[in-house]
């Protein structure tokens, strides 16, 4: 199963998405939390053996530098340098946000003008799997990044050696669907509770993506940073009440 990530136009686009989840002024956002989420996202792509372009890795290096500076003892010169790097990054994100808003405005105008002209039908091309720039799908990926990081830590603390099995996406799709039998929804993190190793977790996640792609499952998230639920596709789906 090929997965092609077309979610973000670059590292600043990813950072802007992470920052916007806080629903506050960019300069008030807890930058350390944003850095952790960015690094977890990139780490997850690498764990899934997906291509991570150089610009994302360069940004990851810059973020790790900012993070390390913030962890150092409060020495005046170091603190000033760390603050400069942080402010520089936030300024870049704010500038990118303005350009993106302008681009969206121009695109809307372009689409409006396009209504006055006839054009040939667009040929639809279907790929094996494509994660479109959909907020909930991106949040699914970010939530999975956190789950994977926690499970890796759990496996490391247990010090247990488990023989590696060959996991198939088709088999895991059945497991995911069976997990929903007799219930209206399933919290994403609960899906991975019994997983025994990283490969099993990743294959389960790929199976979940495939079920979403084939519209057998839908995602529900009530609010930013809230739990993500998996639900079977029905005509009317209710958001789980907490």
UniProtKB/Swiss-Prot annotation:
Subcellular location: Cytoplasm
Pfam family, one: SMC_ScpA
Keyword hit for Cell cycle: yes
A cellular-component GO term for this protein: cytoplasm
Superkingdom, natural source: Bacteria
Primary localisation category: cytoplasm
InterPro entries cross-referenced by the UniProt entry: ScpA, ScpA-like_C
Gene Ontology biological-process entries: cell division; chromosome segregation; DNA replication
Keyword Translocase: no
Keywords, sorted A to Z: Cell cycle, Cell division, Chromosome partition, Cytoplasm
Residue ranges that the Swiss-Prot or TrEMBL entry lists as coiled coil: none
Function: Participates in chromosomal partition during cell division. May act via the formation of a condensin-like complex containing Smc and ScpB that pull DNA away from mid-cell into both cell halves.
PANTHER family linked to this entry: SEGREGATION AND CONDENSATION PROTEIN A
Subunit structure: Component of a cohesin-like complex composed of ScpA, ScpB and the Smc homodimer, in which ScpA and ScpB bind to the head domain of Smc. The presence of the three proteins is required for the association of the complex with DNA.
Family named by the database record: Belongs to the ScpA family.
NCBIfam families recorded: PRK00104.1-2
Designated name of the protein: Segregation and condensation protein A
Organism of this sequence: Streptococcus pneumoniae serotype 19F (strain G54)
Taxon lineage: Bacteria, Bacillati, Bacillota, Bacilli, Lactobacillales
Gene: scpA
């Amino acid at each position: 199963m090929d997965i092609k990530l077309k979610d973000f136009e670059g590292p600043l686009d990813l950072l802007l998405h992470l920052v916007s989840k806080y629903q506050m002024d960019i300069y008030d956002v807890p930058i350390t939390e944003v850095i952790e989420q960015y690094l977890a996202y990139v780490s997850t792509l690498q764990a899934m053996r997906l291509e991570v372009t150089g610009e994302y890795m360069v940004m990851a290096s810059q973020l790790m530098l900012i993070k390390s500076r913030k962890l150092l003892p409060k020495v005046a010169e170091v603190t000033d340098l760390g603050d400069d790097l942080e402010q520089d990054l936030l300024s870049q994100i704010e500038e990118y946000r303005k350009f993106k808003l302008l681009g969206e405005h121009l695109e809307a105008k372009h689409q409006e003008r396009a209504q006055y002209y006839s054009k040939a039908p667009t040929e639809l091309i279907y790929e094996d799997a494509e994660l479109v720039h959909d907020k909930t799908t991106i949040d699914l990926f970010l939530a999975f990044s956190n789950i994977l990081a926690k499970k890796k830590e759990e496996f490391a603390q247990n010090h247990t050696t488990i023989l590696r099995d060959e996991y198939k996406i088709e088999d895991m799709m059945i497991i995911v669907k069976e997990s929903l039998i007799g219930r209206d929804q399933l919290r994403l993190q609960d899906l991975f509770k019994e997983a025994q190793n990283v490969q099993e977790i990743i294959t389960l996640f790929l199976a979940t993506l495939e079920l979403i792609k084939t519209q057998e499952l839908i995602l529900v998230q009530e609010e930013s940073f809230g739990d993500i639920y998996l639900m079977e596709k029905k005509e009317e789906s209710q958001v789980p009440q907490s």
